[in-house]
Amino acid sequence: EIRKNFDVSNYQYQYENVSFEPRGESGITLRGWYIEVDPNAPVVIQTHGMPQNGKCKPEMLLMQGYLAEAGINSLSFDLRNYGNSDVDSDYISIGQKEYKDLLGAYDWLISEKQYSPGEVGMTAISLGGGAAIAFADEPGIGALWLDSAVLDFPLVIKNELERLGFPSFFAGPGVRVGGWLAGVSLTERSPLEAAENAGDRPVFLTHGKEDPRVSIQHSQTFEERMISNDANVTTWYVEQR
């Protein structure tokens, strides 16, 4: 009901259609929308989860509108194999390739819009949690906000098996088969790397305690890693999903 009656007119802004390539990869074009409301303001890269409509998901559009209303610039784009961006595989790689897309977005903002390192933040929702790998690799990303994010790839397979009523011991073979289909090991990189080298860069975690698909254990493990490294982490865990 809230979506049916929600007035979006206050959150509609002029945007620029943009395109760029992943860092270190040519031949793949990523496409998105850039909104600049203040040339002196910082910018946030938005990272979507599933399904395939990517940046067009209602929560992505609303987030971009909220950021603009608050005077913050934003870049929302489709990861590879989503939306209007190029397709390079029949399978997603749960962040193992996609983190390079985020680094490409960062590079584009630095080179084309003249942002300085530290002026670029990043948000990620659900399966977009692989963005944390980009945060781990690029110290110029000044802050990270994760909402119900997948931060442990083997764990999310285990979560899904349990949700569907299958034995959790299939998780290991599932990860291996998924990597074979995607053409990359799904455990080669981990979003948890970001908790090890965040330093004093702020990280905000929010998660539903009863999330039926991405268990709160993802965020809690990330939080524990950050605390053990004396990092700057803030959490908001809600009772309902």
Question: What residue spans do the PLM features occupy?
Answer:
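Short beta-strand/loop motif that positions the catalytic acidic residue
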Residues: 198-199, 204-207, 211
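Short beta-strand element of the alpha/beta-hydrolase
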Residues: 41-49
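Alpha/beta-hydrolase active-site loop
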Residues: 92-113
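The serine-hydrolase catalytic nucleophile loop
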Residues: 50-66, 79, 217
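Conserved alpha/beta-hydrolase
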Residues: 64-86
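Hydrolase active-site cap/lid region
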Residues: 134-185
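N-terminal cap/lid segment of alpha/beta-hydrolase-fold proteins
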Residues: 2-39
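Short alpha-helix in the alpha/beta-hydrolase fold that links the catalytic acid
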Residues: 191, 215-225
